[in-house]
């Protein structure tokens, strides 16, 4: 009986659909700001490290039905 219940629970969990395709409105632009740091070198005391800081602004807007433009 426990095996049947376990099999039903696994079948129920496996049958759930997930929507992986994002949905964006065609009339509204979406703006994202990203910031990151890239460091080079050995992380020990007394040793030099160098790095660069990155800033990025990404805008996603509707272009056509199910087509989007990334700026």
UniProtKB/Swiss-Prot annotation:
Residues in coiled coil: none
Matching InterPro entries: Lipid_transp_b-sht_shell (IPR015819), Vitellinogen_b-sht_N (IPR015816), Vitellogenin/Apolipophorin (IPR050733), Vitellogenin_N (IPR001747)
Keyword set includes Nucleus: no
Signal peptide: 1-15
Induction details: By steroids (estrogen).
Domain Vitellogenin span(s) in chain numbering: 24-71
Keywords: Phosphoprotein, Signal, Storage protein
One annotated GO molecular function: lipid transporter activity
Gene Ontology biological process terms from the UniProt entry: cellular response to estrogen stimulus; response to estradiol
PANTHER family: VITELLOGENIN 1-RELATED (PTHR23345:SF15), VITELLOGENIN-RELATED (PTHR23345)
Function: Precursor of the major egg-yolk proteins that are sources of nutrients during early development of oviparous organisms.
Protein name: Vitellogenin-B1
